Amino acid sequence: MTSPTPIYKLKKEPMRVAGFMSGSGSNLREILKYQKSLKNPSFRIVLIFSDVEDKNVCKGEKIADEYGVPYFCNDIMRFYSSKGLHDKKDMDVRKEYDKNTAELLKKFDIDLIALCGYMSLVTEDIFENFLTINLHPADLSIVENGKRKYAGLQAEGAVLKALLAGETHTRSCIHVVRKDADMGELLARSVPLEFMGDMSKIEDKNALKIISKYHLEVQKRVCEWTMYPKVIELIARGRFQKDKIGVLYFDDKPVPHGADMSEIQGISEHAQEHARVLDMSDIK
């Protein structure tokens, strides 16, 4: 039987990571903070890329300046507009856009792409040439009628669906990016975050939306800000592997539902550092 091999081929120098973002970049900022805290980092963010040039919307340039990382922006709506289009639905144009991005990534010798609130679907020129990972705000290991129940949902929409489905908690997941959205191999699931009490009797839709948004903000701090940097480090250290038939392993053990981050030493303690109490003024 052939042993599984690391999904990232180890090198002498740190793994070179590109962070893709479209908005606030809170996850990317936490990755950079974590990298900076390490004495001998196994990875480095060497490029920040954005598809949004509006500085009021995207904070990529600000984060890049803060941490001394090269920053490039190719506004995707401007790109589509140059083709006479007013939305970004045409995936043939997207492939052309991604082909240009891929050329930039090659110049930086990128090993891994971390999508951090990047709001454009990426195509084959990206994920077939570079190991690409994404974070999803719901538990993708839950299957219903043969499909991932919470695939294709974004932000508080994923949390709201979990709440309405009667889930007692949420988990964020990190997965490998493939052609079908949210359907790639599951790398990791975060520590669980319980809902605040029994929500089953709440019928006010607006109230449920506010609760979902609040829950997501806590989830970012407790689950995502802790998990994303750690998973990148674990990839860089060769601890995620894959066998010839595509089964994913963590530390040589098969993990069909991804590694459970609540079982990784230090994760739960680190999560609590981010778990400050929010008030409703935090929800915008």
Give each language-model segment a name.
Residues M1-K284:
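One-carbon transfer enzymes
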